C-alpha cells in the first residue's frame, strides 16, 4: 500500500501545510499563513492549485502557524467547502483560532476599516462556524465514505485544545504531532502520548509514520523553576514604578502566563504589595481570549481549577477591575507600575516599543527564542546575542540585559479617505458581495440536489433566500448575506443570525407590503429516485437555540427588573458584537469597580465584584465598555488608507530572555519517539531547520528518518503484514467457540478464502476499487487436514488454587510460586507457554491435570 506526502510552501520558505494523499481521499493538515512574509494575493495564488484536490482539513493548534490560512481559504474557495471539504478541530482550537486570526488579519490590514480590506469580521466567524468541533479521543468515522478513514485527536499539551492526530485507514496509521509537550504546565496536562504508567499509548503504537518537526524545543529546566524565575522577574520589573511588557501569542501561551501573573498578584496582596498594579491587554481581538477561557474550563488541568476553587471560589481568569483592554495610544493613561500583555503581531508590538521602549523603567520579557510574526523582537534578540559575554548565560537563567541601541521599526500611518473614495470603495465592496453570494447560492442548491437524490422539494427557506437576495445585499453594513445563505439545512435554528435576518425582513416588510408573499401549504413532489428519508412530509419543530454546551438560556428572565439602575445590555451573553451598553451602571457598581479586586477583608464585596465583572466584562473605567466588542473593525462610515514607513527608534529598556514555551525538550523527544516503534519518522521541510543532534540519535536507534523537501510530493510504500478477513455467516454458524479467559474465545476455522468486491457508494463521491477477503465453508467433499491438538490459554495458579479449595483439597503456595496440593502434587509455571504438573500417578494427580487442561482451549 502507498500514500503520498507533500510539504506546502506558499513562498515563505517554510512548511505552511501538509497534504496527505491516500487512494481515494486527500487531507490538508494545518494550513498556515504569515502575512509578514507572504502577501494576501500570493497566498491565494498558491492555494488555488491545492484546494480543488482536498477532501478533509484538520487543525492541530489554535495558532497562526497552524490555521492562519483557514479563513482566507474558506472565503476564496467557499464552493469547495460547501460541496465537499469537511474541517475538524477541537472546540478550543475553533474558539481561540478566531482570536489569533483576528489579530493576524487586523495587523496586516486584511480586515478592518482600511483600503486594504479583503474580508469582513463576519467572514472569519462564518469560516470557523464551518468547523466540526470534536472532543479528545472522539472518533471521526469516515470509513464508509473514504474507504476506512478514521481520525482521532489526542491532547498535545501545548495550547488549550491542541491536538496530536492519529490518521488511520485500512492499511495505514499515521501520527501527526507538530507541537507537543510531555510535561504538564500551569494550565494543561501533559500530552497523551504516554499513559499514567509512563508507557506509550497503545492506540499510537507502531504507526506507519510519525509526522513531526524537530525545529523547536522547550527548556530542560522544571516548569516550577522557570515559573519562579518569571515571577521574580515580574517583581523586579514592577519595582520603582516600572513597567513590564510581555509579547505573547493570545491563542497560545497567553492563558498560562496570565494565570501566573494572577497568582503573583493574589499572593502579593496578602503582604500589601502590588495592590494597584493594572494588567493591560493590547489585542485586536480585545478580551475574547479570556471570555472563551471562562467557558472552556473543562479543557484545562483539574489541579488548576481546584487550586482556585480553594481561594474563595475565584476563577483563574477573573482579576476584576485590574484588567484593562486598551489600544497602544492609551498607554500614557497608565503611568507607574503596570503589566502589559501585547499580542504577538508586528503592528501592535512596534507601536508599543515606540511608546515605552525608550524608558529605563521598562522591562521586556521575551518568552521564546524566536518571533516569526514580529521582526522587531527578532532584532532585539540579535542585539542581545551579539554580546558574547551575555550569550554565555543565554537564555535559561532569566538574566536582565540593558538594551541601549537603535533599531529600525515599521510604523503604520492611517489617513482618512475622502468621501468620494469611501463611496467608491463601498460600491465596489457591494458588487463583490452580490456576485459572491449569487455563486454561493447556486453551489448550495446544487449540493442540496445531490444530497437529496435529485428529489424536487418545496424548499421554503431556499425560495425566501432567492426573493430577499437584493434586500440582503443592499444591507452590507447590517446582517451579512452569507449568514442566511450558508445556513443550509444543518443547524439553521442554532444560529442567532437567523433572528437578525428575521428582524431585517420585518423592517423591510412595510416597504414591500404589496409584494408580500403568503405561504400556502402544498404537498411535496416525490421522485422514484428520492432517498427513503425524503419520502415523507416536512416537519418543522419549534426553534430552540443551542450552542456547544446545550440549550441557550436567557438569564435576564431570572433577574429582578430594575430598569433605572441595571444595565440590561451587560447581562447579554459574551461575544455578541454590537451589544453596546447604553445606560450607566449604578453608583454602587462604579464604586465596586474602582476598588481593588483582592479585598481580603471584605469577601462580600469581592463576590459582588466577581459577579459584576462576570456579567458585564467592564474594564473598570468611568464609562461602561464592552469587553469583547469588535465593532471598530467593521467598515462603517469612514475608511482609512494604510501607509507603512520605517523609523529608527532608540531602546533603553531592559530585556529578559526566558524560555517558557510548553514544548518537549530535546532529550525527552529523542527517548519518547523511538518508544512508539514507528516504521519511519517524517520531518517537515526545510531540512536546515531540523535539529541534527536528535536526528542522529534517531538514526542510531535504527529509525528511518525522512527529511521532506518543499512543494515536492514523496510517495511512501508500506508492506502489509496483516490481513483483514471476514467470516461468512454460513461458516460462523458452524464454529464451536471455546472460552479461554474472561475476555477471549477461540475456535478452529477451516474454509476457503474468496476475494469479493466492495459495493460502490454514491456516484458523486470519490471511490477506489477495493476488495475484501471472505472465508467461506468448504465444499461437502473436502476434508480438513488433521494435525496434533494445540492448547491455547493461560494457566492461572491463583484460579487453580480456588478450584481445588472448592473441592476440599489443601492447596497452598510454597517457594518461587509453586502450588502444592495435599503435599503430594506440585504445579509450577516455567514461563507463559510451559506449565509442569509434578507428582506420582494417582487420583489426585489426574484431578489436578484435568483442572489445568480445562483452562485451555484445544484446536
Swiss-Prot record:
InterPro entries: Beta_Casp (IPR022712), CPSF2 (IPR027075), Cpsf2_C (IPR025069), CPSF2_MBL (IPR035639), Metallo-B-lactamas (IPR001279), RibonucZ/Hydroxyglut_hydro (IPR036866)
Protein name from the UniProt record: Cleavage factor two protein 2
Record bears the keyword Ubl conjugation: no
Any one GO MF annotation of this record: RNA binding
Assembly information from the UniProt record: Component of the cleavage and polyadenylation factor (CPF) complex, which is composed of at least PTI1, SYC1, SSU72, GLC7, MPE1, REF2, PFS2, PTA1, YSH1/BRR5, SWD2, CFT2/YDH1, YTH1, CFT1/YHH1, FIP1 and PAP1. Interacts with the CTD domain of RPB1/RNA polymerase II; the interaction is enhanced upon phosphorylation of the RPB1 CTD domain. Interacts with PCF11.
Keyword line: mRNA processing, Nucleus
TM stretches of this protein: none
Signal peptide: none
Swiss-Prot/TrEMBL GO biological process terms: mRNA processing; termination of RNA polymerase II transcription, poly(A)-coupled
UniProt superkingdom: Eukaryota
Residue ranges, annotated region (Disordered): 560-611
Amino acid at each position: 500500500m502507498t500514500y503520498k506526502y507533500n510539504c506546502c510552501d506558499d513562498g515563505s520558505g517554510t512548511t505552511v501545510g501538509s497534504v496527505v494523499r491516500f487512494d481515494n481521499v486527500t487531507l490538508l493538515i494545518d494550513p498556515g499563513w504569515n502575512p509578514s512574509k507572504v502577501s494576501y494575493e500570493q497566498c491565494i495564488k498558491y492555494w488555488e492549485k491545492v484546494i480543488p484536490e482536498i477532501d478533509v482539513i484538520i487543525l492541530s493548534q489554535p495558532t497562526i502557524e497552524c490555521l492562519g490560512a483557514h479563513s482566507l481559504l474558506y472565503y476564496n474557495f467557499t464552493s469547495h467547502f460547501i460541496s465537499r471539504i469537511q474541517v475538524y478541530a477541537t472546540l478550543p482550537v475553533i474558539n481561540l483560532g478566531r482570536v489569533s486570526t483576528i489579530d493576524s488579519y487586523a495587523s496586516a490590514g486584511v480586515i478592518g476599516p482600511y483600503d486594504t480590506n479583503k474580508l469582513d469580521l463576519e467572514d472569519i466567524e462564518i469560516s470557523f462556524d464551518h468547523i466540526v468541533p470534536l472532543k479528545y479521543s472522539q472518533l471521526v468515522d469516515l470509513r464508509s465514505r473514504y474507504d476506512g478513514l478514521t481520525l482521532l485527536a489526542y491532547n498535545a499539551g501545548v495550547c488549550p485544545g491542541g491536538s496530536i492526530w492519529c490518521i488511520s485507514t485500512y492499511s495505514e496509521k499515521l501520527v501527526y504531532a507538530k507541537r507537543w509537550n510531555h510535561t504538564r504546565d500551569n494550565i494543561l496536562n501533559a500530552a497523551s502520548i504516554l499513559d499514567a504508567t509512563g508507557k506509550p499509548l497503545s492506540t499510537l503504537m507502531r504507526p506507519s509514520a510519525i509526522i513531526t518537526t524537530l525545529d523547536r524545543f522547550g527548556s530542560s529546566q522544571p516548569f516550577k523553576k522557570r515559573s519562579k524565575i518569571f515571577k521574580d522577574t515580574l517583581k523586579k520589573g514592577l519595582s520603582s514604578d516600572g513597567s513590564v511588557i510581555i509579547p505573547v501569542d493570545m491563542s497560545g501561551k497567553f492563558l498560562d502566563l496570565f494565570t501566573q501573573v494572577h497568582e503573583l498578584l493574589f499572593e502579593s496582596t496578602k503582604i500589601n504589595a502590588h495592590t494597584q498594579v493594572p494588567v493591560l491587554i493590547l489585542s485586536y481581538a480585545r478580551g475574547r481570549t479570556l471570555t472563551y477561557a471562562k467557558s472552556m474550563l473543562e479543557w484545562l488541568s483539574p489541579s488548576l481549577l481546584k487550586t482556585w476553587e480553594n481561594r474563595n471560589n475565584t476563577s483563574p481568569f477573573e482579576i476584576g477591575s485590574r484588567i484593562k483592554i486598551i489600544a497602544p495610544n492609551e498607554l500614557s493613561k497608565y503611568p507607574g507600575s503596570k503589566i502589559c500583555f501585547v499580542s504577538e503581531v508586528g503592528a501592535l508590538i512596534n507601536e508599543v516599543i515606540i511608546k515605552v521602549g525608550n524608558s529605563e523603567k521598562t522591562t521586556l520579557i521575551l518568552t521564546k527564542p524566536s518571533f516569526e510574526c514580529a521582526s522587531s523582537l527578532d532584532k532585539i534578540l540579535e542585539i542581545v546575542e551579539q554580546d558574547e559575554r551575555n550569550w554565555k548565560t543565554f537564555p535559561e537563567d532569566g538574566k536582565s540585559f540593558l538594551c541601549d541601541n537603535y533599531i529600525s521599526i515599521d510604523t503604520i500611518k492611517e489617513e482618512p479617505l475622502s468621501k468620494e473614495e469611501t463611496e467608491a470603495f463601498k460600491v465596489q465592496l457591494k458588487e463583490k458581495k452580490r456576485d459572491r453570494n449569487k455563486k454561493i447560492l447556486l453551489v448550495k442548491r446544487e449540493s442540496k440536489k445531490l444530497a437529496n437524490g435529485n428529489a424536487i422539494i418545496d424548499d421554503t427557506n431556499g425560495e425566501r433566500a432567492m426573493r430577499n437576495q437584493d434586500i440582503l445585499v443592499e444591507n452590507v453594513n447590517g446582517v451579512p448575506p452569507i449568514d442566511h445563505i450558508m445556513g443550509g439545512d444543518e443547524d439553521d435554528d442554532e444560529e442567532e443570525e437567523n433572528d437578525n435576518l428575521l428582524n431585517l425582513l420585518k423592517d423591510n416588510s412595510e416597504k414591500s407590503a404589496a409584494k408580500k408573499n403568503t405561504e400556502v401549504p402544498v404537498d411535496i413532489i416525490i421522485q422514484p429516485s428520492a432517498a427513503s428519508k425524503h419520502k415523507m412530509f416536512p416537519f418543522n419543530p419549534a426553534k430552540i437555540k443551542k450552542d456547544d454546551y446545550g440549550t441557550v438560556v436567557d438569564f435576564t428572565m431570572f433577574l429582578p427588573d430594575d430598569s433605572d439602575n441595571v444595565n440590561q445590555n451587560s447581562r447579554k451573553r459574551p461575544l455578541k458584537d454590537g451589544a453596546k451598553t447604553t445606560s450607566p451602571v449604578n453608583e454602587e457598581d462604579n464604586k465596586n469597580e474602582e476598588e481593588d479586586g483582592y479585598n481580603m477583608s471584605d469577601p462580600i464585596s469581592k463576590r459582588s465584584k466577581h459577579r459584576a465583572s462576570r456579567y458585564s466584562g467592564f474594564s473598570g473605567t468611568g464609562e461602561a465598555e464592552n469587553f469583547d466588542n469588535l465593532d471598530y473593525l467593521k467598515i462603517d462610515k469612514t475608511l482609512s488608507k494604510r501607509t507603512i514607513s520605517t523609523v529608527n527608534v532608540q531602546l533603553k529598556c531592559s530585556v529578559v530572555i526566558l524560555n517558557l514555551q510548553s514544548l518537549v525538550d530535546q532529550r525527552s523527544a529523542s527517548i519518547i519517539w523511538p518508544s512508539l516503534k514507528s516504521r519511519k519518522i517524517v520531518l517537515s521541510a526545510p531540512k536546515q531547520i531540523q535539529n541534527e543532534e536528535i536526528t542522529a540519535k534517531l538514526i542510531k536507534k535504527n529509525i528511518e528518518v525522512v527529511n521532506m523537501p518543499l512543494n515536492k510530493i514523496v510517495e511512501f510504500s508500506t508492506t502489509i503484514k496483516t490481513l483483514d478477513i471476514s467470516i461468512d455467516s454460513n461458516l460462523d454458524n458452524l464454529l464451536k467457540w471455546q472460552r479461554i479467559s474472561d475476555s477471549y474465545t477461540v475456535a478452529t476455522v477451516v474454509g476457503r478464502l474468496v476475494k469479493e468486491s466492495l459495493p460502490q457508494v454514491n456516484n458523486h463521491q470519490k471511490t477506489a476499487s477495493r476488495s475484501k477477503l471472505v472465508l467461506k465453508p468448504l465444499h461437502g467433499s473436502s476434508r480438513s487436514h488433521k494435525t496434533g491438538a494445540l492448547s491455547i490459554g493461560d494457566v492461572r495458579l491463583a484460579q487453580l488454587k480456588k478450584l481445588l479449595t472448592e473441592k476440599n483439597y489443601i492447596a497452598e503456595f510454597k517457594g518461587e510460586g509453586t502450588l502444592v496440593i495435599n503435599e503430594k502434587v506440585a504445579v509450577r509455571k516455567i514461563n507463559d507457554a510451559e506449565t509442569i504438573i509434578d507428582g506420582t500417578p494417582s487420583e489426585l494427580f489426574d484431578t489436578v491435570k484435568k483442572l489445568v487442561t480445562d483452562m485451555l482451549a484445544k484446536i
